[in-house]
């Protein structure tokens, strides 16, 4: 099992939707920037040749954002894993499942625990 921490708050679904509503380029720019930020941490992971399961542990600094909006950011994380060459694809053949847990702390972050399955 591999574990990494992304030590900052990722955009929520509402934030992403608001960017996309501005114009098609704003949403794409946001995603590109988030992918680059996440990529630094994703590059510490090995390449996965077998399917994986991921546990996302979300730490939020306050209770303002709905949990479903928070965990939307897994889309950014999985896309970054594919872009970095850590996963061949993020479809069901390669990502067999995931779960989410949440807590509140001093600073926002997400901790990933990734397990290869056969």
Would you name each region that the model predicts?
Residues 1-118:
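Catalytic phosphate/metal-binding cores of nucleic-acid and nucleotide-processing enzymes, i.e., regions
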């Amino acid at each position: 099992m591999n574990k990494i921490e992304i030590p900052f708050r990722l955009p929520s679904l509402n934030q992403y939707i608001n960017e996309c509503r501005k114009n098609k380029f704003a949403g794409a720019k946001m995603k590109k920037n988030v992918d680059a930020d996440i990529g630094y941490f994703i590059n510490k992971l090995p390449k996965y040749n077998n399917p994986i399961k991921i546990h996302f542990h979300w730490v939020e600094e306050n209770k303002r954002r709905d949990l479903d909006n928070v965990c939307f950011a897994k889309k950014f994380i999985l896309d970054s894993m594919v872009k970095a060459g850590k996963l061949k694809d993020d479809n069901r053949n390669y990502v067999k499942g995931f779960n989410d847990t949440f807590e509140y702390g001093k600073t926002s972050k997400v901790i990933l625990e990734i397990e290869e399955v056969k």
